[in-house]
Amino acid sequence: MKNYIIGFLVFLFAGILVGCGDDNEKEIEESSEQKVEITEAEKVDETDIVAVVNGDDIKGETYNLVYSQLKLHAGAFEEEVDNNEIKQATMESLIDRQLLLQQAKEEGIEITEEVVNSEFETIKSENKEALETLLEQYQITENGFKDQLKFELTLNEFLAKTIEVTVTDEEVEEQYEKAKEGNDSIPEFEEIKDQLKKQLLQQKTDEALQAKIDKVKEKSEIEEKI
């Protein structure tokens, strides 16, 4: 199930849409053809509290949003999707997300509604069709998308403020040698070294972020309600 999760959110939608070109639009269109059913029995009442994290409630509305994202994304990679795994992954994602938001608040990071609305309008004006397809595919409203967008903007600021990672040339070369094993068609090192470096930076950032959240989680009060 971990393979389905990008960081602790499922998708950072704005990251998909910002700078969206023909290739990305095609990917969104193709993925929208995936037929994954989400029944009413899988959803919870939007007003129900699904978890409490250090006194902060997580509501059913957010649970349903993340659950649907996870299941639809999983369905693109697996012929059969285990709903219990999706539920577990959803709860883990929501709890990690809430812990991060709490940590961001302690760091003085606050994304205003004005910033969110401005960013949303930019995305909407530049990628209207892709946005509409994405909202339909993941069964979310514009307000739901804005919630995700606010989280992404918060996450970006939190990463910039609290996490610093580096990747050496030696690490990039080592990664290339690993990738080259058994793969004769891999491009020359100079052609993909920048891409490999970005991948390693992202991997290290994800690991550092998860370690930070896991440390906070150890001393947190968490109650799952479902």
For the regions a language model picked out, list residue spans one by one.
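Short, low-structural-confidence N-terminal segments
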Residues: 1-82, 178-181, 191-226
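Phenylalanine-focused residue identity feature
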Residues: 8-13, 77, 120, 145, ...
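N-terminal targeting/tethering segments
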Residues: 36-140, 145, 207
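Solvent-exposed aromatic/hydrophobic patches embedded in short alpha-helical segments
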Residues: 71, 85-104, 115, 140-141, ...
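Charged, solvent-exposed alpha-helical segments that act as regulatory interaction surfaces
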Residues: 76, 129, 164-168, 185, ...
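Surface-exposed patches in mature extracellular/periplasmic domains of secreted proteins
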Residues: 106-108, 113, 185-188, 211, ...
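Short, mixed-charge aromatic SLiMs
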Residues: 115-129, 174-188, 221
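Charged/polar, low-hydrophobicity segments characteristic of intrinsically disordered regions
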Residues: 130-138, 184-198
